[in-house]
């Protein structure tokens, strides 16, 4: 957007176009601008928004992380609405992951694979899982990462609000139920450096959660989400309800989704199983704002 080059004290309305438009035949059109007296303006990002839904929630979060300078595996977005584009860093691995990107986040519902498969057949299969006419905004072709450790983390306003969880190897099992706290000091140290860097952007991003992979040298960010409900200990979402209904991790994520659909307003969820707060189970409960806590067995 080279032609949108205004000082900070200007308000600018513009549009971005895949084809060249306007009298200057460019990809950006400026519709209106006006100058204001210079003053401090608080800038805060929030998504889902119209653009994140345009390319898919997961793709949008990774673009934000890449823009802010974090290690994001080299990613090509194959979207419905725009031509393919690539961002991120080379991981040194030539294997390709393929990841579906729903319009809005639906934790653990759609396919992520660590090897390439027919993307056209995949889209047909995954669309059938959704409840709308169109559920998938894009697919990601992503450079693989050598996963020595993987997991999730929540980055709060200060370190006392932080949460780190993970497992050895790939994070698929962790996100859908397997839980292990014993990460090495080296991994925790690397994670804390990355989390503090995210915290330096707190005014812009607010409280965020990440999915991460450690390859022995670097922490790679494979998902970035904003969260509205901060978890604490075994509590996923705080709230005052008259009773809690049991939901078992062993029954899977779809069972939890079905239970939420029929849950009374004055009822919460007791999630039973060895699962992490930053797992997809926790994501689903936070996203639906269901008062909930974990009972580990």
Task: Identify what each model region corresponds to.
Residues 1-297:
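Nucleotide/phosphate-binding sheet-loop regions of phosphoryl- and nucleotidyl-transfer enzymes
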């Amino acid at each position: 957007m080279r032609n949108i080059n205004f000082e900070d004290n200007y308000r600018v309305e513009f549009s971005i176009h895949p084809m060249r438009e306007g009298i200057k035949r460019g990809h950006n059109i400026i519709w209106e601008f006006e100058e204001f007296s210079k003053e401090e303006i608080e800038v805060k990002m929030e998504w889902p928004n119209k653009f994140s839904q345009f390319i898919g929630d997961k793709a949008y979060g990774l673009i934000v992380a890449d823009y802010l300078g974090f290690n994001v595996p080299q990613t090509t977005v194959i979207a419905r609405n725009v031509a393919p584009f690539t961002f991120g860093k080379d991981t040194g691995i030539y294997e390709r992951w393929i990841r579906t990107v729903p319009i809005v986040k639906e934790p653990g519902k759609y396919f992520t694979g660590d090897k390439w498969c027919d993307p056209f057949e995949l889209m047909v299969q995954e669309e059938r899982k959704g409840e709308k006419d169109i559920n998938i905004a894009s697919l990601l072709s992503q450079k693989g990462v050598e996963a020595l450790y993987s997991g999730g983390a929540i980055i709060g306003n200060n370190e006392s609000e932080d949460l780190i969880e993970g497992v050895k190897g790939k994070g698929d099992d962790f996100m859908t139920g397997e839980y292990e706290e014993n990460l090495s000091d080296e991994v925790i140290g690397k994670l804390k450096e990355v989390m503090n860097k995210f915290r330096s952007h707190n005014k812009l991003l607010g409280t965020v959660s990440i999915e991460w992979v450690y390859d022995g040298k670097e922490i790679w960010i494979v998902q970035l989400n904003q969260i509205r409900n901060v978890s604490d200990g075994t509590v996923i979402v705080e709230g005052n309800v008259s009773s809690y209904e049991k939901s078992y991790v062993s029954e899977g994520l779809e069972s939890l989704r079905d239970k939420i659909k029929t849950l009374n307003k004055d009822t919460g969820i007791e999630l039973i199983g060895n699962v992490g707060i930053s797992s997809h189970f926790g994501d689903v409960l936070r996203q639906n704002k269901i008062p909930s806590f974990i009972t580990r067995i």
